[in-house]
């Protein structure tokens, strides 16, 4: 912390302990961490989840994103749309609005996050629940057919977004060492996805 504070003071900045949190990621994530105190004597809190650039990161043994806020934002926008036009608009119109307004909210930055199968399944369940509401059915087969027909399969959407993200990053001409290492990883991931 002292090294960070030295750099920040050189830039005429300081650590705002009201907006700064620490999170532990790794095998010892459950161990109670030591308190971190700034030079001014203020304590930086440890958190279970933190928000960084719109993504919520969770304290865990591996780097992991928390999708609760993504799903909550999706449902908020879906309910706003469905509450206004659900009874008067056709299913196609509602799905087009969901595709253009709600899905981007749910998938925001997830192309850069590693997701587990259970997390992907929970995102798929969000879409399934919405389709059940739109088409007034409880049939999984019907809903899955509709999801494929309207091209709203979450795994396919994320794969497309991930390919675009990796291609964009792979074509950058950045000489930073960390960026070069990540670029090599992007190329390998891109090869795995497209094969």
Language model segments and positions:
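A glycine-rich phosphate-binding loop feature that marks nucleotide/adenosyl-phosphate handling sites
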Residues: 19-28, 122, 145-152
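Basic, alpha-helical interaction scaffolds
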Residues: 41-114
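C-terminal, helix-dominated tail/subdomain
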Residues: 127, 136, 146-157
């Amino acid at each position: 912390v002292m090294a960070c504070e030295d750099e920040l003071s050189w830039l005429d900045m300081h650590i705002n302990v009201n907006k700064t949190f620490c999170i532990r990621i790794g095998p010892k994530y459950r161990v109670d961490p030591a308190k971190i105190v700034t030079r001014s004597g203020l304590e930086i809190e440890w958190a279970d989840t933190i928000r960084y650039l719109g993504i919520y990161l969770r304290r865990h043994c591996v780097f992991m994103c928390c999708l609760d806020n993504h799903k909550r934002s999706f449902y908020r926008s879906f309910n706003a749309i469905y509450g206004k036009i659900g009874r008067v608009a056709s299913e196609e119109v509602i799905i087009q609005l969901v595709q253009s307004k709600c899905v981007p909210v749910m998938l925001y930055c997830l192309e850069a996050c590693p997701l587990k199968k259970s997390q992907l399944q929970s995102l798929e369940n969000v879409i399934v629940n919405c389709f059940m509401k739109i088409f007034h059915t409880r049939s999984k087969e019907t809903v899955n057919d509709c999801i494929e027909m309207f091209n709203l399969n979450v795994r396919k959407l994320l794969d497309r977004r991930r390919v675009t993200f990796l291609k964009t990053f792979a074509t950058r001409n950045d000489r930073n060492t960390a960026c070069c290492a990540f670029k090599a990883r992007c190329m390998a991931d891109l090869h795995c996805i497209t094969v």
